[in-house]
């Protein structure tokens, strides 16, 4: 009938944080309930970056598809299992998880902090410092600045990779839609905690 069929673009959950135990420090020893929401209520959590993933796995527990696992202190998404249902997005108290187009070569600013660059460097060695190098380099208008934080518009990004090249801290990464970063790290999904919660009930 002359109508074009819209192409379906699969989506996937994406965690905007790389603040593993190798890149951040602890401000204090948290001894409360092992829950992100609980830890958030105590001085925004124990990590030096108060914007980053706390690693207690509320998102992994909430995911009905076991698509989220914890490794090296932060959450990771296995896109082969993720259905982009969005439950994890609503669960994260730091608002770190976003549903984005699923592209094996996607580029992303894996950071959500809003500190000035100097403060960011003190709290996380791989965070966005707001230098604007990526913003000035992008020829396609795909990168904007939200204060000191660079943001990539996935709909405009052409995956040229220039932003990753100029990023001085490694905050911009590529190809993490497959959920295979830190594959050599021990993984834990939310399944054990789910079982424990069922037993308590």
At which residue positions do the language-model features occur?
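Strongly charged, low-complexity linkers/loops
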Residues: 133, 139-151
């Amino acid at each position: 009938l002359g109508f074009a069929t819209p192409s379906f673009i699969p989506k996937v959950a994406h965690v905007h944080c790389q603040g593993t135990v190798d890149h951040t420090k602890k401000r204090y020893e948290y001894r409360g309930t092992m829950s992100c929401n609980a830890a958030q209520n105590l001085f925004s959590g124990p990590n030096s970056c108060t914007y980053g993933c706390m690693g207690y796995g509320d998102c992994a527990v909430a995911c009905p598809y076991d698509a989220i696992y914890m490794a090296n202190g932060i959450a990771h998404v296995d896109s082969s299992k993720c259905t982009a249902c969005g439950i994890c997005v609503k669960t994260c108290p730091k608002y770190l998880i976003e549903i984005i187009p699923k592209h094996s070569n996607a580029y992303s600013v894996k950071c959500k902090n809003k500190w000035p660059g100097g403060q960011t460097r003190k709290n996380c060695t791989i965070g966005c410092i707001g230098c604007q190098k990526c913003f000035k380099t992008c020829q396609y208008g795909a990168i904007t600045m939200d204060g000191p934080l660079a943001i990539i518009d996935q709909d405009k990004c052409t995956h040229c990779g220039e932003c990753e090249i100029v990023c001085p801290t490694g905050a911009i990464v590529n190809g993490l839609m497959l959920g295979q970063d830190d594959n050599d790290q021990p993984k834990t999904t939310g399944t054990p905690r789910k079982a424990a919660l069922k037993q308590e009930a």
